[in-house]
Design a protein with these regions (language model features):
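Signature of short aromatic-glycine-proline-rich micro-motifs recurring in repeat-based ectodomains
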Residues: 1, 42-63, 115-132, 178-193, ...
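Conserved beta-propeller blade signature
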Residues: 1-3, 65-68, 135-138, 197-199
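Residue-level signal for WD-repeat beta-propeller blades
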Residues: 5, 24, 51, 60, ...
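Short loop/turn segments immediately following the C-termini of beta-strands
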Residues: 6-7, 16, 71-73, 79, ...
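A short loop-to-beta-strand structural motif that recurs across blades of beta-propeller domains
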Residues: 9-13, 29, 81-86, 99-102, ...
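Short loop/turn segments immediately following beta-strands, especially the blade-tip
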Residues: 14-24, 87-97, 150-159, 211-221
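Surface-exposed loop and turn segments in beta-propeller and other repeat-based domains
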Residues: 25-49, 96-119, 160-180, 222-245
């Protein structure tokens, strides 16, 4: 089990029993810091083995990798951004203080600037993995979009470009919107492998968008197939009943 701790600026890894209960109350490994006693001490302290402000994470079991969003202190400051760190979590190779395998969303592990490109993200990120098709979905909240990366072992690379973008017509646009194709400040993501649907929390519009994410049908600027929390794709009113969100 992987637990991202913002206060300590690290990820704690716990062993579980076969029934899902904790094997022991203490973490077995620490990712993002060199030892079990290390914690976040000051801003701008990150590297290939150091996390600063870990957030959303997703585990990919087939290749045993952890995709972790690492934010920077002072996210509201101009120019600050986030990155996605990819760790090897194979039982034979995982280790406290291990270096990352790859960095996505930034050119390297030492960069956390807010950007707008196929290979450069902003901040307020969410992640979800499609294991069968080896894809990583990344919600880029400050750029009002969702990026799709090919994470196959023979394709993934530090600083790589996304293959598809949702919510925008291209990789250099970031306008928020309210429609069947646009979104505003997307956050949490969930992927359903059974029917290949992607659920996007469209925070700025008080709704959840549902996309047909089958590889042969998902395209840049695809239209959502369904909306939850609103009666249609043109409404964004906050609601407090059983059918709405706020």
């Amino acid at each position: 089990m992987f637990v991202a701790g913002n206060g300590n600026g690290r990820v704690e890894v716990f062993d579980l029993n076969n029934d899902g209960t904790l094997a022991q109350p203490t973490a077995t490994y620490i990712l993002g810091k060199p030892s079990e006693h290390a914690r976040r001490t000051h801003a701008d302290a990150w590297s290939e083995s150091q996390t600063e402000f870990p957030g959303a994470l997703a585990v990919e079991h087939s290749n045993q990798r952890l995709f972790l969003v690492d934010n920077t202190t002072g996210q509201s400051l101009p120019g600050r951004g986030s990155q996605i760190m990819v760790f090897d979590i194979h039982p034979d190779r995982i280790a406290t203080g291990a270096d990352v395998l790859f960095i996505l969303g930034q050119p390297d592990a030492n960069t956390k600037t807010s950007g707008l490109a196929a290979n450069h993200v902003g901040r307020r990120l969410g992640v979800a993995v499609d294991e069968a098709n080896q894809r990583l979905f990344v919600s880029d909240g400050s750029n009002n979009r969702v990026l799709v990366f090919n994470i196959a072992p023979d394709r993934i690379a530090t600083g790589m470009a996304a293959s598809t973008v949702l919510g925008q017509e291209d990789f250099t646009s970031r306008e928020p919107g309210l429609s069947i194709r646009r979104m505003s400040r997307p956050g949490s993501l969930a992927f359903s492998p059974k029917d290949e649907r992607l659920f996007v929390s469209d925070n700025g519009n008080n709704r959840v968008l549902v996309f047909d994410a089958a590889p042969d049908r998902l395209r840049t600027f695809s239209a959502a197939t369904d909306v939850m929390g609103q009666p249609d794709f043109e409404t964004a009113s906050p609601r407090t009943d059983m059918r709405g969100f706020a």
